[in-house]
Amino acid sequence: MSTTQAPKRYSPLWVTLHWIIALLIFAAFYLGLSTKDIPLVEKVGILRWHMPLGITVLLLMIVRFVVRWRTPHPEPATAGNALLDKIGEWTHYLIYVFAILMPLTGLVLSATFNLAPVVFGGEGALPRDLSPMLHGLIDPILALLILLHILAALYHQFIRKDNLLARMWYGK
């Protein structure tokens, strides 16, 4: 019986998806936060970019799940501590959940308030404040999870010196 060994790094497709999704999420965060405390007319222009970014993140996250199921990937990194390893595992799961919930709640928000004709067609008016909606409440949770993910990667790279970042980059 032969067993296959897990690869040392993620596939180029996986790496590409990771970094594109990360950039899109940061851009969507920036644009979403830019809509706070500005006139409604200016919000429409920002939402013209923010909404398609969110939909793109959702679609790429679906592709990412398919790639995850169909391609071999490295074993989870270890922090040398069972509790930290479990926190890392759950942080990854929760990032996936919230990275999908964020655009889904954005779509629900858009459908509920019929935002597409307002944002893309210039017909109608935006509601005064959308931030208390579920979409706005998920925002800080996802941001905190991403911050935790980044700090953990830096911990591995510079304190544990296990070259973890090489797993999520191109190379042999």
Specify the residue positions occupied by each region the protein language model found.
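Membrane-embedded alpha-helical bundles that constitute the cytochrome b-like, heme-associated redox core
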Residues: 1-172
